């Protein structure tokens, strides 16, 4: 039990980018996926209408594509959104354009749009995946 608590304490110390990398490493190591399984639900209108209905995505990752000309403003907003320290937020912002530049993972559409709006107002270019 003490060993598990120690592992949890170590994980708490990681930054968002480090956590994302840890998840990728665990997925590769054990051949699993950390994403929640999606259950296929029959759509009543699709069978009757004969058309395929596109399933709307419910969880989004907010990815920083570019921090633009106002890097300091973007760092401030990233700190506000993530709760990271100054150095961690700066490191995350400087990873803009890479797969590690995930600001938030698995958020609902409204929250993702709100985060995107805040970052774009600060001068960043953001993508929702």
From Swiss-Prot:
Annotated coiled-coil segments of the chain: none
NCBIfam families noted in UniProt: L12
The keyword Transmembrane helix is annotated on this UniProt entry: no
GO cellular component, one term: cytosolic large ribosomal subunit
Quaternary structure and partners: Homodimer. Part of the ribosomal stalk of the 50S ribosomal subunit. Forms a multimeric L10(L12)X complex, where L10 forms an elongated spine to which 2 to 4 L12 dimers bind in a sequential fashion. Binds GTP-bound translation factors.
Purpose: Forms part of the ribosomal stalk which helps the ribosome interact with GTP-bound translation factors. Is thus essential for accurate translation.
Name of the protein in question: Large ribosomal subunit protein bL12
Pfam (any one): Ribosomal_L12
Similarity annotation: Belongs to the bacterial ribosomal protein bL12 family.
Keyword Ribosomal protein recorded: yes
InterPro entries associated with the record: Ribosomal_bL12 (IPR000206), Ribosomal_bL12_C (IPR013823), Ribosomal_bL12_C/ClpS-like (IPR014719), Ribosomal_bL12_oligo (IPR008932), Ribosomal_bL12_oligo_N_sf (IPR036235)
Keywords of this entry: Ribonucleoprotein, Ribosomal protein
Organism: Thermosipho melanesiensis (strain DSM 12029 / CIP 104789 / BI429)
GO molecular function: mRNA binding; structural constituent of ribosome
Example GO biological process: translation
């Amino acid at each position: 039990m003490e060993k598990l608590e120690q592992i949890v304490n170590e994980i708490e110390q990681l930054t968002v980018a480090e956590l994302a990398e840890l998840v990728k490493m665990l997925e590769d190591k054990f051949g699993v996926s950390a994403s929640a399984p999606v259950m296929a639900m029959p759509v009543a209108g699709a069978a009757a209408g004969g058309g395929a209905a596109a399933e709307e995505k419910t969880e989004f990752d907010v990815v920083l594509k570019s921090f633009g000309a106002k890097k300091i403003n973007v760092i401030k907003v990233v700190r506000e959104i993530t709760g990271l320290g100054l150095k961690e937020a700066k490191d995350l912002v400087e990873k803009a354009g890479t797969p590690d530049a995930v600001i938030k993972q698995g958020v609902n559409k409204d929250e993702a749009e709100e985060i995107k709006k805040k970052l774009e107002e600060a001068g960043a270019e953001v993508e929702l995946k």
